[in-house]
Amino acid sequence: RVLFRSHNNVEHLLYASSSSVYGLNRKMPFSTDDSVDHPVSLYAATKKANELMAHTYSHLYGIPTTGLRFFTVYGPWGRPDMALFKFTKAMLEGKPIDVYNYGKMKRDFTYIDDIVEAIVRMQDIIPQPNPEWTVETGSPADSSAPYRVYNIGNSSPVELMDYITALEEAVGMVAEKNMMPIQPGDVLETSADTKPLYDAVGFRPQTTVRQGVKNFVDWYKAYYKV
C-alpha cells in the first residue's frame, strides 16, 4: 500500500517504531544518534526492518517518512497482553502476577495521551533531505533522503516494583507476586533521549506513572464494570 500511495502525492508518512530497536545498547538515555544494529527479539528486528523499509521508500520515491520510537506505551484501551492490563486483570480476579527478573528492571513508561500529542504535533514536521548528510559522518536518525526518526518517551525510567506499587495504590490492594527470572529477549532498562523531539515540536511527555496508572485503572473498572 505504501508503494501504491507513493504515486499519489503522499505528503508525509508517520509510522510506529519502538524502543525495542535499541536491543543490546547500554548507553543511557537511548539516542536516535546511536546505532541500532543488535536487536534481541524478533519483534525488535521487525521494527528495525520497518525503519529500513521506510528509508528505502524515502530514497527511491521521495516519500517523507518519520519513524516514532515509542517507549513502553500504557493507558486506557491498551493491549491486553501488556503488563499493566494483565496485572490489573489478575489483581481484580484475586490471582497472582508474574514479575520478571524479580522486579529488577526499569522502563521509560509513556502514557498514551502523551504519545498521541506527540504524533499530532509531528504531522506538520515534514522531513527534508539533508544535503550535508553522509554515511560516514551522519546520524542514523537523519539522511540525504526525506527521512527522520524520533524517540517518544517520558525520559524518566521507573523501577518495575515502583510501577507495581502505583498500580496497587490505584486498585486498592496488594498484589500477590510470582517472582521469576528474566524472559528471553528482554532488556534491563530503557530510557529515551527526547531532546530532538522537543527541538522539533516543543513537547515532552510529562504524565507521571502514578497519574497514568490511576487513569488506566479507572477506565478498566468502568469499561469492564468491576
Language-model segments: residues:
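Aromatic/hydrophobic pocket-lining residues that form π-stacking "cages" and hydrophobic walls in ligand
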Residues: 1, 54, 86-87, 164
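N-terminal Rossmann-like NAD(P)+-binding domain of SDR-like oxidoreductases, especially those catalyzing
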Residues: 1-73, 122-123, 203, 207, ...
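Short aromatic-enriched loop/helix-cap "lid" or pocket-rim segments at secondary-structure transitions
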Residues: 26-28, 78-81, 112, 163-164
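Short-chain dehydrogenase/reductase
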Residues: 40-51, 78-85, 108-109, 157
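C-terminal substrate-binding subdomain of Rossmann-fold SDR/epimerase-dehydratase oxidoreductases
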Residues: 91-226
